[in-house]
Curated annotation (Swiss-Prot):
One of its GO terms (biological process) is translation. The keyword Ribonucleoprotein applies. It comes from the Bacteria. One of its GO terms (cellular component) is ribonucleoprotein complex. GO terms for molecular function: structural constituent of ribosome. Keywords: Ribonucleoprotein, Ribosomal protein. The gene is rpsU. Belongs to the bacterial ribosomal protein bS21 family. It comes from Neorickettsia sennetsu (strain ATCC VR-367 / Miyayama). Pfam families: Ribosomal_S21 (PF01165). This is Small ribosomal subunit protein bS21.
Length: 64
């Protein structure tokens, strides 16, 4: 059966934070889980992914 999280009654935000903590401990990355993220977290994740893509593209460039 599923994991039981102790949260205050009706506190959805806290429940989502606890679920995200649990998933990250299991090695499920933020990009792969489909649960609510704060807008600032989304912006940060997208910025990190963009920087990673740019870095990969720079490594692929062939110096001639």
């Amino acid at each position: 059966m599923g994991q039981v999280f102790m949260v205050h009654h009706g506190d959805v935000e806290q429940a989502l934070r606890r679920l995200k903590q649990h998933l990250s401990r299991e090695g499920i990355t933020p990009g792969r889980k489909r649960i609510f993220e704060k807008p600032s977290e989304k912006r940060h994740r997208r910025a990190v992914e963009t920087r990673r893509k740019i870095r990969k593209q720079k490594l692929r460039v062939v110096p001639y």
